[in-house]
């Protein structure tokens, strides 16, 4: 299978957009807070299950998301606009410093299922990541594109796993200020992505109305 450098840039952009949307480094304090009652082995298991679950959720969104939209009679352009607005709102909360604070309120001490809820969903594979994945699947819908995007999702889940695995060290090295700076940078990248989704959706709808 021949994949051009342009194709690689598409998958890299998708991978970067997921990282910017979820901000794994910014999630480290949340993961640490939620698992501080667990032993080292329990924390490792929680990390693995959470990221594997998020990987499966995003894969389902990639392969079946468009069919789900069609079943509900939702046009992809409407979904692009909704997804763009959602991503912009998340980006704004990240830039303004409210993102981490809001997520901390979802802290749960329930040992049994925090790996799936709320870690895998909605914190890792949340509405923003799911909507972004569905929109991406409509842009690039060949099997080679699905394979490339699947690899990007796997690498994203692996990066999240690495960040959570190294959580104690990262918190100690970066500190609260460093994590806040990274969160704001990710927010700017995310804002640009949301505006791109929004503008493409609006242009497509107006173009259809004019014709």
From Swiss-Prot:
It comes from the Bacteria. It is found in: Cell membrane. GO terms for cellular component: plasma membrane. Keywords: Cell membrane, Membrane, Transmembrane, Transmembrane helix. Pfam families: MarC. Signal peptide: none annotated. The chain crosses the membrane at residues 14-34, 54-74, 76-96, 116-136, 144-164, 185-205. It is a multi-pass membrane protein. Belongs to the UPF0056 (MarC) family. This is UPF0056 membrane protein BUsg_257. It comes from Buchnera aphidicola subsp. Schizaphis graminum (strain Sg).
